[in-house]
Amino acid sequence: MTVTDPIADMLVRIKNANMRRHPTVDVPYSKMKEKIIEILLREGYIAKYEVIGEIPQKYIRVYLKYKGKTPVIQDVKRVSKPGRRYYVNKEEIPRVLGGLGIAILSTSKGIMTDKEARLLGIGGELICMVW
């Protein structure tokens, strides 16, 4: 079955696994998904991840992070979608929950957080927000 929006599919898999308190979740591999997961790891939203398998069955195993029984990722929101792309310039980059969450952008310098994009003074496509 073909997925129309693979990034949204990955985010929903992570969100659903978090809600059910699963220790891991597997998502089909792509370079963009791996970059987004690297950001989640760097920002402390997941414990670790590993790429498993060979193409065409390659996937990413994400190890979820919890504080006691509470998931670290409270919610995720997909902003830019295949049918409606959402671009922001450097002045329009949103602050997620007053700086408690992160926004992930795809810029000309690669995929990065809202803080990194503000420091570089560049905008881009607003992929998602995590808090």
Curated annotation (Swiss-Prot):
The keyword Transport does not apply. GO terms for biological process: translation. The keyword DNA damage does not apply. One of its GO terms (molecular function) is rRNA binding. Pfam families: Ribosomal_S8. GO terms for cellular component: cytosolic small ribosomal subunit. It comes from the Bacteria. Keywords: Ribonucleoprotein, Ribosomal protein, RNA-binding, rRNA-binding. Part of the 30S ribosomal subunit. Contacts proteins S5 and S12. PANTHER family: 40S RIBOSOMAL PROTEIN S15A. Belongs to the universal ribosomal protein uS8 family. One of the primary rRNA binding proteins, it binds directly to 16S rRNA central domain where it helps coordinate assembly of the platform of the 30S subunit. This is Small ribosomal subunit protein uS8. It comes from Dictyoglomus turgidum (strain DSM 6724 / Z-1310).
